[in-house]
Amino acid sequence: MSLKIRLARGGSKKRPFYSIVVADARAPRDGRFIEKIGTYDPRLAKDSGDRVKVNAEKAAEWIKKGAQPTDRVARFLSKVEVDGKAVVAWTHGNNPKKAEPGKKAQERAKERADKAEAKAAAAAEAAAAPAEEAPAEAAPAEETSES
């Protein structure tokens, strides 16, 4: 039996209130659950102590038994400590592939880089060519002065 620690919605319309419950993963969101281990009231201020209440010992016990917390509950449990340790080590999602641009954008960026490289090479050649020609122009000027 796959267990989840998740939120079960309660409260009335436009006034949400959630219970943090341990339930079978196949059970409906607000359906049957095994045990209620806390509450979450999103209407309270984020710094309020009553916003999230969790029985940390029960949560740690269920995690040891194999219950998987959802992302939101894992965030809550990472702030709760048992014996000086967070119940869950939660880090903000890191998906580097999601941040990469799409194929077309990568192709356009490559084309821009190639054009910039070509332009820089042309500018370098143009800067080097007049420097070489300048002494050649100076030499005929000297010859004309001698003749």
Curated annotation (Swiss-Prot):
Pfam family, one: Ribosomal_S16
Record-linked SUPFAM superfamilies: Ribosomal protein S16
Sequence ranges of Basic and acidic residues compositional bias: 97-118
Key words, A-Z: Ribonucleoprotein, Ribosomal protein
Compositionally skewed regions (Low complexity) per UniProt: 119-147
Molecular-function GO term, any one: structural constituent of ribosome
Region (Disordered): 89-147
Record has Lyase as a keyword: no
TM regions (residue ranges): none
GO BP of this protein: translation
Record-linked InterPro entries: Ribosomal_bS16, Ribosomal_bS16_dom_sf
CC per GO annotation: cytoplasm; small ribosomal subunit
Family that this chain belongs to: Belongs to the bacterial ribosomal protein bS16 family.
Cross-referenced NCBIfam families: S16
Name the UniProt record assigns to this protein: Small ribosomal subunit protein bS16
Source organism: Hyphomonas neptunium (strain ATCC 15444)
